């Protein structure tokens, strides 16, 4: 980094120095009768002719230098004082910013530490509520089931005790006792199991449906299974002979044939392996070598002197 150095004292000293000495007139030849004397006199006069302008330029330059030196001395001093004031202000501002930054950092650190601590009670309450919900639901279900069982038992006993033909005679008592012994209506048991002799034909994905025969006497199925409005259903054992007759009836079996699967028949047959291609094997494991012998011609190739003599003698 380049630093600027200033010396106001030297600038003031330069501004207070005396001005330059003006140029003096040069000697002029007095002249003479000859041409040389005349030329020398003209040269001296022409040399001294521009001394006035040169002296004026020198004096103007000196005045300009003095003014610049004094201006530099004043401006550098004022600039130094202004820079010192600015540095003091920057230092104070920097200290304030540093203090605010330190305070912000400390508050952020404390917030990061205290944040989880303030959330601990809320998290504990949420965990307690989550743990209590299964217990509360189980208690509510238990209380609701006990209350419903007590109400249903009371209604069932009231309905059985209010029937006119159930309390007279031993037979009625036996029938009533059998009915109150916990028999379950056949309508709640669902369809009967399929016999093992005939495999079921109903697909696994199809819903099971029970087909029941209408009760004898033209009564609707709803009237046979449904009691009075708002009263529980009476077991078949408490209904006398009709209850026994309805209990012996069996529902009619219903067979459902599933649609055939396309291309689902098993494939029968045999696979024939094609014969392998014949291969050529070398004899005794060695390759067969073929040789070609070329015979030379009689007159063109391989003729020697005795052969020519023999041909000439022939």
From Swiss-Prot:
<feature type="transmembrane region" description="Helical">
    <location>
        <begin position="23"/>
        <end position="43"/>
    </location>
</feature>
<keyword id="KW-0812">Transmembrane</keyword>
<dbReference type="GO" id="GO:0005886">
    <property type="term" value="C:plasma membrane"/>
</dbReference>
<feature type="compositionally biased region" description="Low complexity">
    <location>
        <begin position="203"/>
        <end position="212"/>
    </location>
</feature>
<feature type="compositionally biased region" description="Gly residues">
    <location>
        <begin position="165"/>
        <end position="184"/>
    </location>
</feature>
<feature type="compositionally biased region" description="Pro residues">
    <location>
        <begin position="190"/>
        <end position="202"/>
    </location>
</feature>
<feature type="transmembrane region" description="Helical">
    <location>
        <begin position="221"/>
        <end position="241"/>
    </location>
</feature>
<keyword id="KW-1133">Transmembrane helix</keyword>
<feature type="transmembrane region" description="Helical">
    <location>
        <begin position="98"/>
        <end position="118"/>
    </location>
</feature>
<keyword id="KW-0472">Membrane</keyword>
<feature type="compositionally biased region" description="Low complexity">
    <location>
        <begin position="219"/>
        <end position="232"/>
    </location>
</feature>
<keyword id="KW-1003">Cell membrane</keyword>
<feature type="compositionally biased region" description="Basic and acidic residues">
    <location>
        <begin position="294"/>
        <end position="314"/>
    </location>
</feature>
<protein>
    <recommendedName>
        <fullName>Uncharacterized protein MT2145</fullName>
    </recommendedName>
</protein>
<feature type="region of interest" description="Disordered">
    <location>
        <begin position="165"/>
        <end position="314"/>
    </location>
</feature>
């Amino acid at each position: 980094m380049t630093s600027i150095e200033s010396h106001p004292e030297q600038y003031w000293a330069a501004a207070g120095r005396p001005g330059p000495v003006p140029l003096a007139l040069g000697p002029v030849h007095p002249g003479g009768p000859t041409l040389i004397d005349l030329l020398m006199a003209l040269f001296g006069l022409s040399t001294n002719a521009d001394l006035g302008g040169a002296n004026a330029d020198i004096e103007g330059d000196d005045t300009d230098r003095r003014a610049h030196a004094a201006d530099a001395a004043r401006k550098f001093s004022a600039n130094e004082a202004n820079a010192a004031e600015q540095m003091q202000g920057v230092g104070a501002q920097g200290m304030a910013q540093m203090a605010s930054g330190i305070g912000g950092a400390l508050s952020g650190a404390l917030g990061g530490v205290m944040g989880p601590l303030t959330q601990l009670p809320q998290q504990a309450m949420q965990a307690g509520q989550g743990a209590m919900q299964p217990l509360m639901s189980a208690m509510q279900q238990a209380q609701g089931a006990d209350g419903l069982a007590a109400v249903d038992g009371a209604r069932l006993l009231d309905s059985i005790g209010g029937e006119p033909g159930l309390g007279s005679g031993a037979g009625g008592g036996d029938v009533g006792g059998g009915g109150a012994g916990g028999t379950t209506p056949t309508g709640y048991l669902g369809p009967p199991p399929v016999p093992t002799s005939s495999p079921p034909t109903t697909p696994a994905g199809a819903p099971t449906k029970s087909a029941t025969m209408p009760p004898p006497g033209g009564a609707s199925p709803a009237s046979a299974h449904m009691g009075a409005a708002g009263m529980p259903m009476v077991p078949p054992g408490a209904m006398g002979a009709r209850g026994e007759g309805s209990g012996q009836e069996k529902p009619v079996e219903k067979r459902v044939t599933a649609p055939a699967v396309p291309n689902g028949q098993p494939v029968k047959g045999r696979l024939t392996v094609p014969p392998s291609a014949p291969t050529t094997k070398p004899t005794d494991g060695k390759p067969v070598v073929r040789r070609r012998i070329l015979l030379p011609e009689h007159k063109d190739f391989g003729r020697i002197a005795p052969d020519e003599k023999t041909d000439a003698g022939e």
